[in-house]
From Swiss-Prot:
GO terms for molecular function: DNA binding; zinc ion binding. One of its GO terms (cellular component) is retrotransposon nucleocapsid. Retrotransposons are mobile genetic entities that are able to replicate via an RNA intermediate and a reverse transcription step. In contrast to retroviruses, retrotransposons are non-infectious, lack an envelope and remain intracellular. Ty3 retrotransposons belong to the gypsy-like elements (metaviridae). This is Transposon Ty3-I Gag polyprotein. Capsid protein (CA) is the structural component of the virus-like particle (VLP), forming the shell that encapsulates the retrotransposons dimeric RNA genome. Nucleocapsid protein p9 (NC) forms the nucleocore that coats the retro-elements dimeric RNA. Binds these RNAs through its zinc fingers. Promotes primer tRNA(i)-Met annealing to the multipartite primer-binding site (PBS), dimerization of Ty3 RNA and initiation of reverse transcription. It comes from the Eukaryota. SMART domains: ZnF_C2HC (SM00343). PROSITE patterns: ZF_CCHC. The lineage of its organism: Eukaryota, Fungi, Dikarya, Ascomycota, Saccharomycotina. It comes from Saccharomyces cerevisiae (strain ATCC 204508 / S288c) (Baker's yeast). Keywords: Acetylation, Cytoplasm, Metal-binding, Transposable element, Zinc, Zinc-finger. Transmembrane segments: none annotated.
């Protein structure tokens, strides 16, 4: 008897989730890997539970299989081992979720998060890379840990004096507004990036940027240790997935960087010629929809 034949519903069980999904109104937008994404686990579980509440499931086994479809290694390998250890006929969905949470969740280390933030600056990174890094680190902050005003102050301290003054002049009410204002300000004036010079028409062009590109290529760390140290038994498996570094490089190859946009006189938003960011129709249409 195969492993799947032991599931209530017999050998036809693996087809069950596929038959249910066409009537499923929402699909989880998240996946959980179990490596350096502990801060995403609560949202992942909440979204899984929300989607499951919209249709009826015949048994706990079907709910477990649905959740496992959104796990990547090493979390996927852990789920396979956990189900076999507990027994497919005895394990409940609540037990599975509780085991997933206890095994992979690590409380964020606030001191490490703030130390990582203080290492950032617009002068060193430029506004685009500053925002990218800041978002990545800030996402690990516990929800409602500080007020919106305190969050804005934390971010604006990383800006150059010129950008800081312009952002504060517009009095942003949310962190998102402050980051957007800093981005728009730099994109419109094009005067806060080192290595730029003006051509005969007064437009900004790029000077030698080889060293900047080399620094950008080494911009991504393989480990983001911003959680409290805690012993976790991890099952060692062969990697059957793409390395994170490859994903970042592919993304840079597919999307024009900020420097390339300036060099080729492209819009920062739609990457097309003939207009600037504040004139982009696609960007305005997207803002109206949201």
């Amino acid at each position: 008897m195969s492993f799947m034949d032991q599931i209530p519903g017999g050998g036809n069980y693996p087809k069950l989730p596929v038959e249910c999904l066409p009537n499923f109104p929402i699909q989880p937008s998240l996946t959980f890997r179990g490596r350096n994404d502990s801060h995403k686990l609560k949202n992942f579980i909440s979204e899984i539970m929300l989607n499951m509440s919209m249709i009826s499931w015949p048994n706990d086994a079907s709910r477990i299989v649905y959740c496992r479809r959104h796990l990547l290694n090493p979390a996927a390998q852990w789920a396979n081992d956990f189900v076999q250890e507990q027994g497919i006929l005895e394990i409940t969905f609540d037990t599975f979720i509780q085991g997933l949470y206890q095994h992979f969740y690590k409380p964020p280390d606030i001191n490490k998060i703030f130390n990582a933030i203080t290492q950032l600056s617009e002068a060193k990174l430029g506004i685009e890379r500053l925002n990218q890094r800041f978002r990545k680190i800030w996402d690990r902050m516990p929800p409602d840990f500080m007020t919106e005003k305190a969050a804005i102050m934390t971010y604006t301290r990383l800006l150059t004096k010129e950008t800081y003054n312009i952002v504060r002049m517009h009095k942003p009410e949310t962190l998102k507004d402050a980051m957007e204002e800093a981005y728009q300000t730099t994109a419109l004036t094009e005067r806060f990036f080192p290595g730029f010079e003006l051509d005969a028409d007064g437009d900004t062009i790029i000077g030698a940027t080889t060293h900047l590109q080399e620094e950008y290529d080494s911009d991504y760390d393989s480990e983001d240790n911003l959680t409290q140290n805690r012993y976790v038994h991890t099952v060692r498996t062969r990697r059957s997935y793409n390395k994170p570094m490859s994903n970042h490089r592919n993304r840079r190859n597919n999307n024009a960087s900020r420097e390339e946009c300036i060099k080729n006189r492209l819009c920062f938003y739609c990457k097309k010629e003939g207009h600037r960011l504040n004139e982009c129709r696609a960007r305005k249409a997207s803002s109206n929809r949201s």
